[in-house]
Amino acid sequence: MKTPNILFLMSDEHRADVTGYEGNSVIRTPTLDWLAETGTVFRNAYTPSPICVPGRQCLMSGQLPKTVGCEGWVDLQSNHMTFARQLSRYAYETVSCGKLHHQGDDQMQGWTQRPAGDVHITSNHIANRSETHFQEYSRSFSTFKWSDAKEIKRAGVGSSPCVTRDRFWTDSALHFIDDFFNSAYYDREQGQKPLLLKVSLLQPHYPYQTDHDKFTYYLNRVVPYLDQSVFPHPFLSQRQVRPGTDVSEREIRRATAAYYGMVETIDSQYQEVLEALTHVGENLDEWIIVYTSDHGEMLGEHGIWEKQKFFEASVRVPLIIRYPERFEAKVIDQNVNLCDLFATLCHLAGIPCPSGLDSRTLVPLMEGCAENWANETVSQFGKTNLMIKKDHLKYQNYGVNGQEVLFDLYRDPSENQNFIDEPDYVESVSWFRQRLSQLGHGPNADPNYVNAGYTSDVRT
């Protein structure tokens, strides 16, 4: 079997249940539904951090925030090991079109080409920098920063920077595909290098704006989160937007409709990429196709918008891997993490995976062997806020003086009740607190913490 090409499709802020394949009867996502029907769906996939920069850099590095040292808006060290760098070392042409959100002077991080890059300037680029001056410089580029309820109020028909950039990045991917497989056919070496092509779009990240047709289609079909009880917790209740007070119910409906429209837009743009590959003669059944997002979107649930929380809407992400040459379509319920994609891609490509990662290959699950899977996953926000999910229980710790939270997703799938002090959960809470220390968090943190303790060596 030849070394497989890989298509890595990614979005920004896509909550997992706004997809047809998860049973949402309102949203139109035929492309993602096709991937799900013919691929492997991971129903309990979680981001390592429910915010863009750490989530994406952990995905690329196969390491959790504490391991990689990216617990906020910080740089990934130059020449850090990423799955793109590992694949390129083993002959892959690694090409990224769209958003990466890398910080620091190494804007490639293992990608051999970035036809339409998303370069982010940080203060670490500037010699003899002044942080104050840089903040003013950076602020001049911030044309759509979040500010309380502003994004909800201006939601509707429009063409935000996310919309225009996604169109540009999709077009760049289409041009690259034509050039790589078609235009260069007669002058490239025979036995061309295998390809890793990442197409990473900004939508459905706010601003909540979409085109007229999609907006009007969804406006009276969506069911917005209106009568939401706010969870009584100092962190989980932060940035509440109150229906009828901060924003009107109509404004919430408009923002929800626009969000759905953006999801449909990226679905159609992914279809363009798939059709382009088919047009140049590629058999998609021979490709590994991955789809995921960096985190979810609260969309008004619990009165909260955006992300940054450990509620399911924010921390759970869509994840599909399609490779019909090797795997039958199935749905997997085990807890997995975006960090696991590093080891998985190495395994599927038949190359070694570096040791010392917080990454576990998902291939055994895809093969139907779940007996030895440690059914837990981890997510971190900032330096002190940590979530550990074990089976159906989801524990959260918010630092030395923070209030602990325990959700039971079987008994309370809407996450309205904190079971942390319930007698039935004493043993579970004890286990979570011990695991918290093992992961280098909490008052009894293990000073020798290195990584999550997963075995990531994959030899094929």
Region locations from a protein language model:
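Formylglycine-dependent sulfatase
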Residues: 1-396, 403-404, 413-434, 441, ...
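Residues forming the ATP-binding cleft of Hanks-type serine/threonine protein kinase domains
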Residues: 410
